[in-house]
């Protein structure tokens, strides 16, 4: 990671715009390498209101310095520019100074695709459902929960370094089916331990927000879908509301609360509501136990063969042209699932 001159790059397209950053694809003119450029949203820059985003950018750079070598889940940051005018590259007339981050292109596909693709009837929730909620391809051991395990391990390292990484929803996680590896593409939402900030609803954002995200996005209390349509829609993407309301909604949607795995989930929810997790490892233990019970329930379901047939049919949707816009070769990535 080093300071970069953008004269070595040429923009090739717009990938999207988030709450703080505009994201574009670019190519290195000397090597042909495809990269991703992130800068503050242009409208915010032109109003000279981008100082908070610049502070967030500095925090991201510092995080990479401290943690990148000890993790294998962060999208590599090639470098960053000095805080200056970048009109020569962007050619948009913006003369204010700002920093641009230059990332490697994340491998794999997002667990949930771009919401705008829904207009084109793209089943953007397919990866999340196939690989995190209903991983019916590998039920013999806990490796089927590789996404959850990687997120827990990443957060543990952040927490030990005095940071809490949030906004870990499936749209910010790329996944490689062939290896089970994840890549986190957004480190913008961090809270320092001991310096937790009050959120929009009056409660300080802390490690419990991470616990909520894990249960909200990466667990589900339902049997596997009985049709392909059940795999198409993303799960849990409604914005997080207040803690109590969020937890009550999760309990309300638990199907068959008398089932052992669902009892464990309700127990976790109640512990979060009552702030009973006094150590991060205790949440890890409870979640691991819960996922183990879910795996056994899937594995021992008498209708498993039927559910798996639907799962494999749904997997074929990832061979559509839409997913080729990512760093993803379907024939290679999905070959291990061939019957």
Residue ranges and their predicted role:
Residues 3-30:
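ATP-binding glycine-rich phosphate-binding loop
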Residues 20-73:
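ATP-binding glycine-rich loop module of kinase domains
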Residues 76-139:
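Conserved structural core of kinase catalytic domains
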Residues 147-148:
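Activation segment signature within eukaryotic-like protein kinase domains
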Residues 155-176:
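Catalytic-loop of the protein kinase fold
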Residues 182-265, 282:
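C-lobe/activation-segment region of protein kinase-like
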Residues 271-297:
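Terminal C-lobe "cap" of eukaryotic-type protein kinase domains
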Residues 295-339:
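Regulatory extensions appended to serine/threonine kinase catalytic cores
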């Amino acid at each position: 990671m080093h300071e970069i001159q953008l004269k070595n790059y040429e923009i090739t397209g717009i990938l999207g715009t988030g709450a703080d950053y505009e994201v574009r694809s670019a190519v290195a003119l000397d090597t042909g390498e495809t990269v991703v450029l992130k800068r503050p949203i242009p409208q915010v820059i032109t109003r000279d209101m981008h100082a908070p985003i610049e502070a967030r950018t500095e925090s991201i750079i510092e995080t990479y310095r401290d943690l990148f070598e000890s993790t294998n889940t962060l999208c590599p940051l090639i470098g960053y520019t000095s805080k200056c005018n970048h009109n020569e590259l962007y050619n948009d007339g913006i003369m204010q100074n700002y920093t641009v981050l230059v990332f490697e292109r994340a491998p794999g596909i997002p667990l949930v695709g771009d919401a705008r693709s829904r207009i084109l009837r793209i089943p953007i929730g397919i990866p999340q459902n196939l690989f995190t909620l209903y991983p019916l391809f590998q039920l013999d051991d806990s490796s089927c929960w590789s996404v959850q395990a990687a997120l827990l391990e990443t957060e543990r390292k952040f927490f030990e370094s005095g940071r809490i990484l949030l906004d870990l929803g499936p749209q910010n996680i790329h996944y490689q089916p062939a290896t089970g590896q994840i890549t986190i593409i957004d480190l913008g939402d961090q809270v320092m331990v001991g310096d937790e900030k009050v959120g929009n609803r009056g409660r300080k954002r802390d490690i419990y927000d991470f616990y909520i995200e894990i249960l909200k996005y990466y667990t589900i209390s339902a049997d596997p879908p009985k049709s392909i349509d059940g795999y198409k829609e993303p799960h849990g993407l409604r914005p997080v509301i207040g803690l109590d309301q969020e937890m009550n909604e999760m309990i309300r949607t638990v199907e068959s609360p008398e089932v052992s795995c669902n009892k464990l989930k309700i127990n976790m929810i109640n512990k979060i509501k009552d702030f009973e997790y006094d150590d991060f490892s205790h949440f890890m233990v409870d979640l691991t136990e819960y996922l183990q019970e879910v795996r056994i329930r899937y594995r021992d379901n008498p209708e498993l063969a039927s559910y798996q047939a639907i799962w494999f049919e749904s997997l074929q949707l990832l061979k559509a042209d839409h997913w080729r816009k990512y760093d993803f070769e379907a024939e290679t990535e999905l070959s291990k699932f061939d019957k």
